[in-house]
């Protein structure tokens, strides 16, 4: 029960007071799919990530599923229930079905359906239950495969505070992108916190991350190498030489980092994938310092 009792009233997580009403409704027999959902998740432990969210969902299912109301009579808008226009479909029924209809369903032989289903869903943690309990049960009832994975990401706070209109701390994405750049903001969001966790957003954190990683590390390395090659090698790279021990060590590490990168990306662990990139950049900076090609120019012009 997510309701909070305050001053004799029940308050929803959103802060709104809960009003109890009665209305006629159609129900989906969600309870009949409890065991099958448990079996599916036990056999597919990577189908919900991060792991903490998987455990959360499985615990919820095991606690007992109740049948789900899937129609409303108090709404004047919505998709009518077949054969009973007094009812409209519960919004999450038609919203979730968009994943299928947008790729050609009910034509399961369409190219888009074959290419894109089952799909990877990346959703906010607040709508995880809809995507990992109700949605797969609907699909199983329709004899369709559940999503290949549901990844639940966290929320951002603004300098430690929840982002809301009432607090006046909503972040204007256009302003931020205009100031720092689109790819830079994407990089910050993925690099700053593990994808799936909550994170704190601040302009100071953006500046520190961009300066440390992109300017001082990546940017400095590219500038050092490219300016040297342009100045001393007529902007050409030659490969007619034998690798020394340091070359082989860096090449071996590059392969290792690339394999780790692919592994982490396949599990949406984007922060870990980026960490591999910057570990390799650090190793490359050390390699360049040790090789000191600016000194080699004086002793070996070739």
Regions found by a protein language model. Give the residues of each.
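Short, flexible, mixed-charge glycine/proline-rich loop motifs
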Residues: 1-7
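Structured secondary-structure scaffolds
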Residues: 10-231, 273-277
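Short, structured coil/loop segments at alpha-helix boundaries
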Residues: 46-58, 181, 241-251, 299-302
């Amino acid at each position: 029960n997510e309701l909070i009792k305050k001053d004799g009233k029940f308050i929803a997580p959103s802060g709104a007071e809960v009003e109890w009403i009665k209305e006629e409704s159609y129900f989906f027999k969600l309870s009949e799919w409890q065991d099958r959902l448990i079996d599916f998740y036990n056999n597919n432990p990577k189908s919900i990530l991060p792991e903490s969210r998987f455990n959360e969902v499985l615990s919820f299912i095991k606690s007992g599923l109740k049948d789900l109301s899937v129609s409303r009579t108090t709404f004047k808008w919505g998709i009518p229930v077949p054969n009973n226009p007094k009812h409209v479909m519960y919004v999450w029924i038609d919203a979730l079905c968009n994943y299928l209809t947008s790729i050609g369903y009910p034509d399961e032989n369409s190219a888009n359906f074959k290419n894109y289903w089952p799909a990877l869903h990346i959703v906010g943690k607040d709508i995880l239950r809809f995507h990992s309990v109700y949605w797969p049960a609907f699909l199983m009832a329709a004899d369709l495969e559940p999503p290949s994975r549901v990844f639940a990401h966290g929320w951002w706070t603004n300098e430690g505070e929840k982002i809301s209109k009432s607090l006046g701390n909503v972040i204007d994405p256009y302003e931020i992108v205009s100031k720092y750049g689109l790819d830079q903001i994407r990089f910050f969001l993925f690099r700053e916190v593990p994808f799936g966790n909550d994170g704190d957003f601040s302009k100071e954190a953006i500046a520190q991350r961009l300066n440390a990683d992109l300017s001082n590390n990546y940017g400095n390395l590219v500038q050092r190498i490219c300016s040297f090659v342009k100045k001393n090698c007529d902007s050409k790279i030659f490969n007619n030489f034998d690798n020394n021990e340091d070359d082989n060590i860096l090449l071996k590490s590059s392969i290792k980092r690339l394999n780790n990168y692919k592994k982490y990306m396949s599990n949406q662990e984007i922060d870990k994938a980026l960490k591999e990139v910057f570990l390799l950049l650090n190793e490359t900076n050390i390699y360049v310092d040790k090789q000191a090609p600016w000194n080699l120019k004086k002793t070996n012009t070739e």
